[in-house]
Curated annotation (Swiss-Prot):
This is Protein FAM193A. InterPro entries: FAM193, FAM193_C. The modification Phosphoserine is found at S293, S383, S642, S1129, S1144. Keywords: Coiled coil, Phosphoprotein. Residues 355-365, 757-769 have a biased composition (Acidic residues). Residues 893-905, 915-929 have a biased composition (Basic and acidic residues). The gene is FAM193A. Residues 868-877, 931-940, 1149-1159 have a biased composition (Basic residues). The lineage of its organism: Eukaryota, Metazoa, Chordata, Craniata, Vertebrata. Residues 255-271, 772-781 have a biased composition (Low complexity). Residues 107-142, 873-932, 1093-1118 form a coiled coil. Belongs to the FAM193 family.
Length: 1265
């Protein structure tokens, strides 16, 4: 019908064009046809409806739909509303009107009659459209109801675990002789479990409807306080519902350790029972909420969980005030406040704290006895106004229609999502201001504590991308240490900055404490004590407990990202609350601090972020200490090496890029990332502190640590915003450890491009083949082809001599030699102090001082004496250059400071604008809340939701627009660009992309600029590895494939399923497509790696052995990088590999040798390194690095890959021709030593159960070196 009409219309248009005289007749013809079609349809519908009596009477009638109405609606919707038709109708009608006036061939009557018919039909169709809207609402409501019923049934049948739990609790209760004090608890519990406690009977909460599943039952029990006796309605307003003496902490006994009350609405709430942290209770601060430092802080909660936990149902005034971050003005003055007196409070601070506990805690903190009247002992947030309203206002009558609302409707998160028809974005997307809790446009949900998140809202593997993550991750119970004794204090969010403690569904703040105290003056000692405690000491500490989903790939990007660097990636769905621009701006725009600068990355004066994401590597992170002075955050003891990446400069003052510490190209960690990007990566992971400030926080640390899982390579790739491609100068794209961010202060490279001029290359011709900027097989003509390998290993251990001489493998002896040399150096140290002090102005030697002393030996090396002279000259040149660089660095720093100031001002402006947005939004929301309360449930979704949705989106857009502006130059574009630009910021990728395959992947994905790099890199790497069984390498690849392919937690590493999950899921939140892309990329890359390996193998067979020695060394190194120390910055690898291949692909034989040599060295070297480093004073990063490889983490290939993923780039040698590049003498020697250490550390393979039989088969060829 539609086609016929449109055909007629187009034909009429063609005819009408040439001769306007035919206009009215054609209009008449078309309108007549339209009306005839409509009439025919209506007639047919009426005829057919006689046969559809059953359908109409039994089904359609309940929606007040008739078959005829349905057909009319279809006509109106599909035909009459057709844009083409609508655009032409006015013209046609005007033609008909024209026909009534001009006496055409047809009589006037014909036109006027037709016009009247048309107008009647149009009116009828408009009525039909309106009627259908009403019917549609009814149909939607019915569908919602059916869906909730089905979901409820499905849950009841599926969740056997809950039934078991319930049975267990019942048995426990019935068998246990209750102490008299516990009788009340036991009875209540049994009652609740057995009768499912019809909600109207619940004396403690006004919530009338609840999902019947056991999860909800238990949640209700936990939330409403089991031991509270029923409170009668006539209870005196001031009478306290609970007994004054704190009841035994039943909940603490029975509930899983770190479950915090789901009701806790503040972004920073944590499972801290108040008694344990009385300091958390602030003093009366007017009407400021206690745990939310500002109204804004709570917004995310309402945004994320309004649909899950309508906070308006809380009984306690304090809870309402605190949790919602709004005061008695909302919700009818003190009504909600009064609720508290009507019934026992639901403690929001902790699942285990009862009101009595709160009172006790308050008493403690304020110096009052626990029994003090509640008005006095109130949490600090209660303002006098609150108390007045509480005392004066009568108990609110809960809106009746709410009580009557479908009692059988399932209130679980998923059902609610479906039933409301709202995209969670409406609720979740914008950080809705606190008022939203009251208005939850959908059916209010139970403010319950869900013990079984997989039931509520957790869709397996997150197949439904829009749903928020599970409330508590299944690994919740994995780590007791985190629970009672050392609960973390809520984050010290400062009102102005922490606008949005993102309460992302995935990162439930109410469960994963924001690890810092709420008080601005919070001192680091608390942090130290917390983290120095069992939490950090627990070797198997599972970050999953408090970061359950945070690290899962997308979450890190999504929630966490939204948390810390909202702008880094556009939130995939409104699943992530738009991050507050100021948080990201603070770090991001204010001063693009190079991520190397550790404390910058981790904190801004008062904001401390736990680098504990490092814990994710499951390495024991013992004392992670925070030095409050200078807000400098140091991880002083064993922290997974990856944290070391961030340590490029420890303090702001010394943020200069030190040559030895992090040579330009050295794999110092995060390499060219524009300063903030990694922060985005690990933000959440790192910081259970959702304080946005911490946007920068330990991102760098996380990407490497948590990502140790093999499967992570991919994910991490996609979840690390790709660095912006640095400009390239000549063939070298930004050296990996050179920050490509032109604004990064203290770097010696301008515009992220390494300026070859900076190193004079005059005498570099014959220098070591291990120099920074050239790769082992550098094609540079100045490298002597026939020279034997002069790498650190060969030089130091004397196996660079005539080819016939077999290399010594007496590692014990080597270690001894090293030890002796070290002691000698230490004796000589005083002499060299002057020289070092000169350098200190430019370079921060604190971390490698001893190492440099050790390597800067005047002692003749076993190789050639001419080289010593050359080094001396080189050193002299370098000293001069360093003075120049120092001046430049100072100038740059000055510029940075100015720019930072400017950015701060911009941020403040943006902050103000954001505040205005929030206020406006909150006002609108409050209005809507009031309206919503009056409306019936069925009307609410259809009418309020659209508005909320719109508001939410506006708000989200507003908040996001700000972040995004600052974001771009900071590298948030990196996320999307990642695959293409990966080679530009290789080191970052390496850090993030765990297994070497990741490196290959990076290379492959690299954009054209670096394709050659990546090509070389892969082949070389692969060649080095492929000829051998390289079970390690392939293990990694396999894990990687599995992890990515399945998106499953394939990780075998100790970090438990949680870390594994993080790696694989990161992309999900980052971008809708991020995940698939990353995974396919990683798979493709692995495949590429294999194919390239094959090609190169062929190629290398053909190649001559001229460079065998050198290449051998480098390949060895490179391979070592790929394997035991994978993270070496890709840039490094790429450059090296580039050179390696360029000069001459390596012969296969050599690779084998390398393998073997590598294999043998690995074990002893580990010991050597571990022995040496401590004595060197290389405490932090190197030790972590070495420890990582020691037995603790070498359980299986996966954990090895984990180790590999985290290795500190700083400690990986650069595969470059040291001779062909002008590099500081010190740097060169550092490289030598790194090589030695790296080779030694490779012994880890043995512990990984590598099949050594293959290596032994090649012994014969090995001597041929």
């Amino acid at each position: 019908m539609k086609v016929r009409l449109l055909r007629q219309l187009s034909a009429a248009a063609k005819v009408k064009a040439p001769s306007g005289l035919q206009g009215p007749p054609q209009a008449h013809q078309f309108i007549s046809l339209l009306l005839e079609e409509y009439g025919a349809l209506c007639q047919a519908a009426r005829s057919i409806s006689t046969f559809l009596g059953t359908l109409e009477n039994e089904h359609l009638k309940k929606f007040q739909v008739t078959w005829e109405l349905h057909n009319k609606h279809l006509f109106e919707n599909l035909v009459f509303s057709e844009p083409l038709l609508q655009s032409n109708l006015p013209a046609l009608v005007s033609q008909i009107r024209l026909g009534t006036t001009t006496h055409d061939t047809c009589s006037e009557d014909t036109y006027s009659t037709l016009l009247q018919r048309y107008q009647r039909s149009e009116e009828e169709l408009r009525r039909v459209a309106e009627e259908w809207l009403e019917c549609q609402k009814r149909i939607d409501a019915y569908v919602d109801e059916q869906m909730t019923m089905k979901t409820k049934q499905r849950m009841l049948t599926e969740d056997w675990e809950l039934f078991k739990q319930r049975r267990f609790i019942e048995e426990q209760l019935t068998n246990k002789k209750a102490v008299t004090g516990e009788n009340n608890f036991t009875d209540t519990m049994r009652h609740m479990l057995s009768s499912r406690l019809s909600m109207p009977d619940c004396p403690n909460c006004n919530y009338r409807r609840r999902c019947a599943c056991d999860d909800c039952s238990l949640s209700h029990i936990l939330t409403c306080g089991i031991m509270d006796p029923p409170v009668t309605d006539d209870i005196h307003i001031h009478q306290l519902p609970l007994q004054v003496d704190p009841a035994p902490d039943y909940l603490a006994e029975r509930s899983p350790p770190s479950v915090s009350s789901a009701s806790s609405g503040s972004g920073s709430s944590s499972p801290i029972t108040i008694q344990q942290h009385p300091r958390l209770i602030l003093t009366d601060s007017g009407s400021a909420p206690t745990f939310c430092s500002d109204d804004e802080d709570v917004a995310p909660l309402s945004a994320k969980f309004a649909d899950i936990y309508p906070l308006s149902n809380y009984d306690d005034t304090e809870v309402v005030a605190n949790m919602n971050g709004i005061h008695s003005e909302l919700n009818g003055g003190g009504e909600n406040m009064a609720l508290k007196d009507e019934s026992p409070q639901i403690s929001s601070t902790s699942s285990s704290s009862s009101e009595a506990d709160d009172e006790e805690a308050d008493g403690e903190s304020s110096g009052e006895p626990p029994g003090a009247p509640k008005e006095d002992g109130v949490l600090g947030s209660r303002s006098p106004r609150t108390e007045e309203s509480k005392a004066d206002s009568p108990p609110p009558s809960y809106p009746t229609q709410q009580a009557e609302q479908a009692p059988n409707t399932c209130e679980c998160h998923v059902c609610k999502q479906e039933a409301s028809g709202l995209t969670p974005s409406a609720m979740t997307a914008g950080a809705l201001p606190p008022g939203h809790q009251f208005l939850s446009p959908e059916k209010p949900t139970h403010p319950a504590l869900h013990l079984y998140p997989h039931i509520h809202g957790h869709v397996p593997l997150h197949t439904v991308p829009h749903l928020p993550r599970p409330l508590i991750h299944p690994t919740l119970y994995a780590t007791p240490p985190f629970t009672h004794s050392k609960a973390l204090p809520p984050a010290p969010v400062q009102n102005h900055t922490n606008k949005h403690q993102v309460f992302n569904a995935s990162l439930q703040d109410h469960i994963y404490p924001s690890c810092f105290g709420n008080t601005p003056e919070w001192n680091s000692s608390k942090f130290i004590s917390l983290w120095g405690s069992e939490v950090m000491n627990d070797k198997n500490w599972n970050p999953g407990t408090f970061l359950p989903d945070t690290i899962s790939g997308s979450e890190i990007l999504g929630p966490t990202l939204s948390e810390t660097r909202p702008e880094a990636l556009p939130p995939p769905s409104s699943n992530e609350t738009p991050a507050v621009s100021d948080s990201k701006e603070k770090k991001n725009a204010a001063k693009k601090k190079c991520l190397y600068n550790f404390q910058d990355a981790f904190m801004e004066a008062n904001k401390v972020v736990m680098a504990t994401s490092s814990a994710t590597s499951s390495v024991s992170c013992t004392a992670t200490t925070v030095q409050s002075s200078n807000s400098q955050f140091r991880v002083s003891s064993k922290r997974p090496p990856s944290v070391g990446d961030v340590f490029h400069g420890i303090s702001k003052e010394d943020h200069r890029h030190s040559a030895p510490a992090a040579p330009r190209n050295s794999p110092t960690g995060l390499a060219p990332l524009p300063a903030l990007s990694p922060a985005a990566l690990s933000p959440a992971a790192l910081s259970p502190a959702s304080t946005p400030h911490l946007a920068n926080l330990a991102a760098p640390s996380f990407p490497k640590t948590a990502t140790t899982t093999p499967g992570f390579v991919d994910t991490r790739k996609s979840f690390c915003p790709a660095p912006l491609p640095p400009a390239t100068d000549g063939s070298i794209s930004a050296p990996p450890s050179v920050c490509s961010d032109p604004d990064c202060e203290g770097h010696r490279c301008e515009n992220g491009v390494y300026d070859p001029q900076q190193d004079d290359g005059d005498e570099s011709a014959d220098e070591d083949s291990c120099s920074e900027h050239s790769s082992s097989t550098s094609t540079s003509t100045n490298q002597k082809e026939g020279k034997y390998c002069d790498c650190c290993y060969c030089e130091f251990f004397g196996h660079g001599g005539p080819p016939a001489a077999p290399t010594s493998r007496n590692y014990a002896e080597m270690r001894e030699k090293l030890r002796l040399r070290l002691t000698k150096r230490k004796e000589e140290q005083p002499k060299k102090m002057d020289q070092i002090s000169e350098r200190e102005s430019v370079v921060d030697h604190r971390r490698v001082e001893d190492l440099l002393q050790f390597i800067n030996s005047s002692e003749t090396k076993p190789v050639s004496s001419t080289r010593a002279a050359k080094r001396a000259r080189h050193k002299q040149r370098k000293l001069e250059e360093k003075a120049r660089l120092e001046a430049e660095a100072r100038a740059r720093e000055h510029l940075h400071l100015q720019e930072e100031q400017r950015r701060r001002e911009e941020e403040e402006d943006e902050e103000e604008e954001e505040d205005r947005f929030k206020e406006e939004f909150q006002r609108l929301q409050e209005l809507q809340k009031l309206r919503a309360v009056k409306k019936k449930k069925k009307e609410r979704p259809s009418k309020d939701c659209p508005k909320l949705d719109m508001l939410t989106r506006n708000f989200q857009a507003a908040t996001e627009s700000v972040p995004n502006s600052g974001n771009i130059h900071n590298g948030s574009l990196e996320q999307t660009e990642e695959p293409e630009t990966s080679s530009h910021s290789p080191s970052r990728h390496m850090n993030h992309s765990e297994p070497r395959p990741g490196l290959g992947a990076d290379g492959d994905a690299a954009d054209p600029v670096d394709t050659r790099d990546s090509k070389f890199l892969l082949p070389k790497e692969v060649n080095g590895k492929q000829h051998e069984p390289l079970s390690f390498f392939f293990d990694i690849m396999q894990h990687h494939k599995e992890g990515n392919g399945k998106q499953k937690l394939r990780q075998t590493s100790k970090a438990s399923s949680e870390p594994a999950r993080r790696p694989t899921e990161p992309p999900k939140a980052t971008e809708g497509q991020s995940k698939p892309r990353a995974q396919t990329e990683s798979k493709a890359k692995v495949v590429d790696l294999m194919s390239i390996t094959e090609q190169k193998r062929e190629e290398r067979k053909v190649n001559s052995n001229n460079n065998n020695k050198k290449q051998l060394n480098h390949i060895k190194d490179e391979k070592s990088n790929p394997t035991p120390m994978e993270p070496t910055s890709p840039g490094e690898h790429q450059q090296n590999s580039k050179l390696v291949l360029a000069e001459s692909p390596q012969p296969k034989g050599k690779n084998k040798k390398n393998k073997k040599k590598k294999g043998d060295r690995v074990n002893n070297s580990i010991d050597g390194v571990s022995l040496l480093l401590p004595s060197l004073g290389y405490n932090g990063a190197i030790l972590a690095h070495c420890n990582l490889r020691l037995p603790g983490s070498s359980d299986c290939a996966a954990s090895a890959s984990q180790v590999v993923g985290i290795t500190d780039d700083v400690f990986l040698p650069k595969d470059i021709d040291l001779d062909s590049v002008d590099m500081d003498e010190t740097e060169r020697e550092v490289e030598y030593f790194k090589r030695f250490c790296l080779d030694s550390a490779r012994q880890t393979r043995q512990r990984l159960s590598i099949n050594w039989s293959n290596f032994s088969l090649k012994k014969a060829t090995f001597a041929a070196h």
